[in-house]
A protein has these predicted regions:
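Accessory terminal alpha-helical modules
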Residues: 1-189
Length: 189
């Protein structure tokens, strides 16, 4: 069954539609109210298997693009998606946005309530993490990224000095199995 809106735009089942069309089989579809489409699609998909954070991300990024075709690139889920493209971990980005990893933030993310209060600072911190990751493989590690978030919150943390020290003493920073160890590694650097 294909899900369409009142304008017959396919909301769910694009691949099924293509396969049915190619096979010449009869097509069945359900028309739903556009206002209900978001909750209906999420509910339908979570009943078959639980959605992962990146599936919510793609869903809401697509919704932002549809609702704001001229400026969707500056919308919260698109900024988040751009950072995910660079392999920054999901919880690291939640920490950068909210200075916290509380469950309520991830629940809100899945409900379409992502809000980035300071987009410029978020982008600056993402760019810093991308630079650090390019400079040292340990910065790709989740615990290192989360530990760096704690430092990024500190106004006295000098990003340039950190990157210079990382270049000079790369052996001091190693992947860590705990965030405490990652924090200590960064501190000793």
């Amino acid at each position: 069954n294909i899900i369409v809106d009142d304008q017959y735009v396919i909301l769910e089942g694009q691949h099924r539609y293509e396969a049915i069309k190619d096979l010449g089989l009869p097509l069945t579809y359900t028309i739903i109210n556009p206002e209900d489409s978001e909750s209906f699609i999420i509910s339908m998909n979570t009943n078959t298997k639980n959605w992962k954070n990146d599936e919510y991300l793609n869903f809401y990024a697509k919704k932002e693009k549809t609702k704001n075709p001229l400026n969707y690139h500056d919308m919260p889920y698109h900024n988040f998606k751009r950072a995910r493209y660079y392999k920054i971990h999901f919880m690291t980005l939640i920490e950068l946005i909210y200075s916290s990893r509380q469950k309520e933030h991830t629940i809100g993310f899945g409900k379409g309530k992502l809000f980035i209060q300071d987009k410029a600072l978020f982008k600056e911190n993402v760019n810093f993490l991308v630079t650090a990751m390019k400079q040292h493989k340990a910065c790709e590690h989740r615990n290192t990224q989360l530990a760096l978030c704690k430092y990024l919150i500190d106004k006295n943390f000098d990003k340039e000095t950190f990157l210079e020290k990382l270049k000079k003493f790369p052996d001091k920073l190693v992947p860590s199995s705990t965030m405490d160890q990652a924090t200590l590694n960064i501190k000793t650097l």
